Amino acid sequence: MEVENEAHCCPGSSSGGSREYKVVMLGAGGVGKSAVTMQFISHQFPDYHDPTIEDAYKTQVRIDNEPAYLDILDTAGQAEFTAMREQYMRGGEGFIICYSVTDRQSFQEAAKFKELIFQVRHTYEIPLVLVGNKIDLEQFRQVSTEEGMNLARDYNCAFFETSAALRFGIDDAFQGLVREIRRKESMLSLVERKLKRKDSLWKKIKASLKKKRENML
């Protein structure tokens, strides 16, 4: 198994030099964001959770044989823009937008949460994963798998269907987000290295031209 929890509750700073990933859970109230988070960090399904409460969780995991320290913010279900929400939107490195497959309105509201990210970050190039939760309640399904896949394609992000009750697909969702964060960081690093090489080449050309001018004098 590629995702392995090493600790359910970690100290305030990452241990062993692990890379810290700040993850923000978004989605309408009642879609199971907290249950998904709790299953990931502690393999437990909560009996009750107040959807108006925002909470933070930390855990140490290994993903693709690399340590990862996840700092997960589980947000309330409101899609309104607030000063506090702006603060954690700015700090988040990756986002999981969650909806319930048994609630079409929560699926439609996914667009609102994606727009909230854009309002703060002014770009759509932010690591993102779309999650359709509660697939164990298949008899009450209102949103098809195909609809979820199509929306994720529009968002240019990975898509996972999960069941917090059965702990199905939970690790895959967080794993996918961390991989996307790493991928984008790797791309950015590659661009920066290319720019540095171009800058270095440009300086060499200018130095060569300067030397030629000096020799002509």
UniProtKB/Swiss-Prot annotation:
Positions of GTP binding: 27-34, 74-78, 133-136
Consequence recorded when altering T52A: Loss of interaction with AFDN, RLF and RALGDS
InterPro entries the record matches: P-loop_NTPase, Small_GTP-bd, Small_GTPase, Small_GTPase_Ras-type
Alphabetized GO MF terms: calmodulin binding; chromatin binding; G protein activity; GTP binding; GTPase activity; semaphorin receptor binding
Superkingdom, taxonomy of origin: Eukaryota
UniProt keyword list: Calmodulin-binding, Cell membrane, GTP-binding, Hydrolase, Membrane, Nucleotide-binding, Nucleus
GO biological process assignments: adenylate cyclase-activating G protein-coupled receptor signaling pathway; maintenance of protein location in cell; negative regulation of neuron projection development; positive regulation of MAPK cascade; positive regulation of neuron projection development; positive regulation of transcription by RNA polymerase II; Ras protein signal transduction; regulation of calcium-mediated signaling
EC number: 3.6.5.2
Gene3D superfamilies xrefs: P-loop containing nucleotide triphosphate hydrolases
CDD domains: Rit_Rin_Ric
Activity control, per UniProt: Alternates between an inactive form bound to GDP and an active form bound to GTP.
Pfam families for the chain: Ras
GO cellular-component term (any): Golgi apparatus
Record field: catalytic activity: GTP + H2O = GDP + phosphate + H(+)
Major place of residence: nucleus
Tissue occurrence: Expressed in ganglion cell layer (GCL), inner plexiform layer (IPL) and inner nuclear layer (INL) of the retina. Expressed in retinal ganglion cells (RGCs). Expressed in horizontal, bipolar and amacrine cells, but not Mueller glia, of the INL (at protein level). Neuron-specific. Expressed in ganglion cell layer (GCL) and inner plexiform layer (IPL).
Compartment annotation: Nucleus; Cell membrane
Additional remarks: Shows rapid uncatalyzed guanine nucleotide dissociation rates, which are much faster than those of most Ras subfamily members.
Subunit structure: Interacts with PLXNB3. Interacts with AFDN, the C-terminal domain of RALGDS and RLF, but not with RIN1 and PIK3CA. RLF binds exclusively to the active GTP-bound form. Binds calmodulin. Interacts with POU4F1 (via N-terminus); the interaction controls POU4F1 transactivation activity on some neuronal target genes.
Role description: Binds and exchanges GTP and GDP. Binds and modulates the activation of POU4F1 as gene expression regulator.
Family affiliation: Belongs to the small GTPase superfamily. Ras family.
Full protein name: GTP-binding protein Rit2
Lineage of source species: Eukaryota, Metazoa, Chordata, Craniata, Vertebrata
